[in-house]
Amino acid sequence: MSEQVIIFDTTLRDGEQALQASLSVKEKLQIAFALERMGVDVMEVGFPVSSPGDFESVQTIARNIKNSRVCGLTRCVEKDIDVAAEALRVAEAFRIHTFIATSPMHIATKLRSTLDEVIERAIYMIKRARNYTDDVEFSCEDAGRTPIPDLCRVVEAAINAGARTINIPDTVGYTMPHEFGNIIASLYQHVPNIDKAIISVHTHDDLGLAVGNAMAAVHAGARQVEGTLNGIGERAGNCSLEEVIMAIKTRHDILNVHTNINHQEIYRTSQLVSQICNMPIPANKAVVGANAFAHSSGIHQDGVLKNRENYEIMTPESIGLKEVQLNLTSRSGRAAVKHRMEEMGYQDNDYNLDDLYSAFLKLADKKGQVFDYDLEALAFISRQQEEPEFYHLDYFSVQSGSSVMATASVKLICGEETQSEAATGNGPVDAVYQAINRITGYQVSLVKYQLTAKGQGRDALGQVDIVADYQGRRFHGVGLATDIVESSAQAMVNVLNNIKRAQQVEKEIQRLQQHNNQQQNDSKQQNSQETV
């Protein structure tokens, strides 16, 4: 009987570190729901002590996720662990993941400590975390460059302290597969209490070996793999979970292990992460790339037509990739749209049908036919806009040409008021943005602008993803329309609403801090009076 490999997803923690702008709580929650639907066993959703925003997102996800274990990351620091426990305690099941560096280089130059002191600190912090939950994971940061005897000492002590999962990271993507497999095998050989914990691995792709190292570790006995969807992450990225999952499924004959992943959800989840994180998937990306199941060579095409297994070791259907269909028009009713969403695997609570159908009719009037990917894009945008927004784009008009300066007129709905302005700019998009800045009074500067075609042909939707700077902080915005200038305007309006929301959060945090300070002062005065 094959053993299970636990899939530990860190897209919302390690993966998010690669993004130019942080995701909103709503965006993180949408990804978390998709990961839960895909069947990940554990999802690491943030670093709660790092910021009030991260604390809020971890707590929100912990409150809403029911079928996956929610995890928060901490350093081996008391405050980190206490704050993580506070954020996670609303979850039905949660894990605290704490780490400390173990390589000689990190201990000497970063921690300015000794191995004995590191072990002592790890033991204390693991026990502290165990006060909050039985599910504690401990990571030996830079384990790939830690001498095996030292690593064995740390792992044995961590297990004795109560860690149920021991994670072995190749933090800088340095090791080769045979080396990394040997590290895992050595732990099984030399750590006497190794049977009391699950051995996990966390690999990075600096040398393009993250998946290879993870598979070598699984072959050597590791039973948890950490990674991200599409391999997103710092520097060259993390281990691509979709590749690990399909490698385990495809090469069961060699590995004799399995996962509890719903493989039919892989492609959809991958696309969702790509869209929300504004990180396009390379066409030649294994498993989920546009060319992963494409055959252009005549010999290959002939072989596939005769028997797909000649050149396909897995099928598009095995990851939930279905053929694009041309079956929805402006004459299609709500029931048809709902049925198509069900066929694509969406549940009723994944999207707002009223908003989706309204947006669908507008698009269908423009395009005539609406594709599956159009429908998903509209559902995604509708999901983002479910909460009332302060700013709405009411109207815009642009005049531009090769011999005239671009001029834009924009009308925004700002709460209960409507305001209009006109401005010139370096092109139609810049003119629109200058007019919007005049209306709001925000001096928002564009940092990154990316246009992606969603669909095919002249009627394709244009998705504009932007990163904008406001008072030293970066905000992400997305817009979707058949008109590029319109989608650009929508993206900036999305940024404005994110800025407005961030300001409201800051005010609420200040109010809570003032309230807490007042309570502390009142308590001190009361204690002083009692003493007198």
Swiss-Prot record:
InterPro entries: 2-IPM_HCS-like, 2-isopropylmalate_synth_dimer, AIPM/Hcit_synth_CS, Aldolase_TIM, LeuA/HCS_post-cat, LeuA_allosteric_dom_sf, LeuA_bact_synth, PYR_CT. It is found in: Cytoplasm. Residues 5-267 form the Pyruvate carboxyltransferase domain. It catalyses: 3-methyl-2-oxobutanoate + acetyl-CoA + H2O = (2S)-2-isopropylmalate + CoA + H(+). Its EC number is 2.3.3.13. It comes from the Bacteria. The keyword DNA-binding does not apply. Keywords: Amino-acid biosynthesis, Branched-chain amino acid biosynthesis, Cytoplasm, Leucine biosynthesis, Manganese, Metal-binding, Transferase. It holds the Pfam family HCS_D2. One of its GO terms (cellular component) is cytosol. Mn(2+) binds at D14, H202, H204, N238. Its cofactor is Mn(2+). Residues 513-532 are annotated as: Disordered. Residues 392-532 are annotated as: Regulatory domain. One of its GO terms (molecular function) is 2-isopropylmalate synthase activity. HAMAP family: LeuA_type1. Homodimer. Catalyzes the condensation of the acetyl group of acetyl-CoA with 3-methyl-2-oxobutanoate (2-ketoisovalerate) to form 3-carboxy-3-hydroxy-4-methylpentanoate (2-isopropylmalate). Belongs to the alpha-IPM synthase/homocitrate synthase family. LeuA type 1 subfamily. This is 2-isopropylmalate synthase. It comes from Pectobacterium atrosepticum (strain SCRI 1043 / ATCC BAA-672) (Erwinia carotovora subsp. atroseptica).
